[in-house]
Amino acid sequence: MAAKTPRNLPETIQFICALGLLFSGLASQAQYTDVINSNRPGKANGAYAVGKGVIQAEAGLFFEQQDHSLLNTESGIYGLDLALRYGLLLERLELHWEGIYQGQQITYLNLETEERLSDFYSNRLGVKYLLYDRYKNPERNKPNLYSWRANNVFQWSNLIPSVALYAGANFVLGDNPFYPGEPTVSPRAMVATQSRLTPRFVLITNVAYDRIGTDFPEWSYLVSLSHAFRNPKWSVFVENQGIQSDRYSDVLLRSGVAYLISPNFQADLHLGAGFKDTPSRIFIASGVSYRLDFHQDEVIPIEDQDPIGRNNMMKSGRKLSKEESRSQRRAEKRNKKRQRKQSAPEEDGQ
């Protein structure tokens, strides 16, 4: 069945363009990192952009086994998962395309026949903008020199996330067997949050409303928790995804590992499964992420820089907490004792 073009196609394109212009008029803040910032492994999108001038590709191969108990079918699915990300105009703004091209072989056990399908299962283009940066203040990125606990133990304030907004569209081109009768273009909106629970644990959440205005709109959520080991090149993650739609609903679990080969190159492996049997799903995927780093730090004119306050050298004028004050006093006492011990032999020698 040929894909239908919705009447609201011009409005959808105008909406995306207007949103991009709105974001481009907002103030920028550095999002660039020295190490590649990849959404792989897993499906969750982090709140942060790749950085202005950075071109990043994230690709992987996957295989999935689906068995449907009611339809009495078995399916083998294989394909390519690809995402292209570009830091556009601002440090906070990112242009994001993602697509999944897959082949599916369906065996109808009752009829003893087979069917083969192949096309884009996902084809999206959108923009993501970091609306609120929890660590915009550089003081929050600095370690507490007076308290080991403050640096390594979970604090409730760490749950306050950075927040990003995503707006884009799905594209169904030609006679796509996975979406018969689906409009050519349908909007997609998402809110992404990212919290640094501890220096090694990061929590990411996504809430998305997809295929808006179609016969099968879809709500979904993602919760992903990642952990970096003592060797920071290695990290693991666990992820929960929920999907609610008249076409398909399920709850999925994923878990895997990532390895940083170089600052611009990462490899990953993950597997997962669903909870339902209509269909049951078991899958495995492996991929890489690579970036072309053309980022350049912007020079801020001196007249645009913040003035230096009289207390800027003392925690930027911030009053120390009780715990920080106690830790500071203990550190000062230890330093005084150490100085007295060092000066005592010199006095005896005189």
Predicted feature locations:
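Functionally engaged cysteine thiol sites
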Residues: 7, 17, 52
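Sec-dependent signal peptide hydrophobic core
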Residues: 13-20
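N-terminal secretory signal peptides that target proteins for export/translocation
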Residues: 1-12
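Short stretches within intrinsically disordered, low-complexity N-terminal or propeptide regions
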Residues: 4-5, 20, 29
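Transmembrane beta-barrel domains of Gram-negative outer membranes and organellar outer membranes
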Residues: 31-212, 216-258, 262-270, 275-350
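Glutamine-centric residue-chemistry signal
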Residues: 14, 29-31
